[in-house]
């Protein structure tokens, strides 16, 4: 008798599980995530992918492309979503690829992302440097010369990144092009050189953003300091105001990151659209994960493990997102 009860219970569980799986909104639908070539974006992308899998979707490995290509792929429907839309940094690319007519963007995935220019604290204190405009002085600029040409060397952005245009625009607006060189290339490799210079006690001058591992390695306020700018200046926005409530101006507004999806796809998939709108990830959690990657735990398997760990530590929140998304399908 006991065996038959156990069998009946197991059979009922199997049937309900199969029925539930068949009822999931994503059954039979494949999702193609897209991100940039920055591997530190994989963590947040995979977190969204995991939640989509719980809705029944088959989610492919993220494609890694330049941001411009990513937005074009999303607009055409070749890609389904990206978890790394920066506002306002990517606004020009977003609009150029079709804007709100082509894209679905609701909610805020990550709040409080910062970016700007930093120098080592030792040099800042010694020469009383607080503002990037001080580098108009050739004597000050020369402190950050790494190749002997007399100009300050700024560790800057990869070609094609949103920050590239902003930096070039600001160097021109602040009349720094004669005394500052914007060095571009592989950002991670350039920053590794910059950090080596710092460890040798040499002055450093670089652009960075959070969330990213750099500020775990060179801590603002302790090792390095943010430089202010003389006035707000962003490309394509004459009315840009990057001044903070306390009057400080670091040249960039505090950014937000969003999940952006192909609009037509999102309209046909209300559960996924709801998920994209409600997921939220603290910037500190991304910084912490990026730091672990920088310490050597950066393989595909490692990052999957970081996602597992985050979900386990926030299971109730994660399940809440999934359940709320499922309710939107009904």
From Swiss-Prot:
Q: Where in or outside the cell is it found? A: Periplasm
**Origin superkingdom:** Bacteria
A GO cellular component term found in this entry reads:
membrane
Q: Name one Pfam family in it.
A: OpuAC
Query: Known InterPro entries for this protein?
Result: ABC_Gly_betaine_transp_sub-bd
Tell me the first and last residues of the signal peptide.
Answer: 1-21
A GO MF label: quaternary ammonium group binding
Where does it mainly reside? periplasm
Keywords, ordered alphabetically:
Amino-acid transport, Disulfide bond, Periplasm, Signal, Transport
- Write down the Gene3D superfamilies for this protein, in alphabetical order: Glycine betaine-binding periplasmic protein, domain 2, Periplasmic binding protein-like II
Q: Which GO terms describe its biological process?
A: amino acid import across plasma membrane; cellular response to osmotic stress; glycine betaine transport; glycine import across plasma membrane; hyperosmotic response
Kindly list the cysteine pairs connected by disulfide bridges: 157-163
List positions binding substrate.
86, 90, 161-163
Annotated CDD domains: PBP2_EcProx_like
Give the induction note.
By cold shock in a PNPase-dependent fashion.
Q: Does the keyword Mitochondrion apply?
A: no
**Assembly and binders:** The complex is composed of two ATP-binding proteins (ProV), two transmembrane proteins (ProW) and a solute-binding protein (ProX).
As for what it does, the entry says: Part of the ProU ABC transporter complex involved in glycine betaine and proline betaine uptake. Binds glycine betaine and proline betaine with high affinity.
The molecule here is called Glycine betaine/proline betaine-binding periplasmic protein
Q: What is the organism field in this record?
A: Escherichia coli (strain K12)
Record gene name: proX
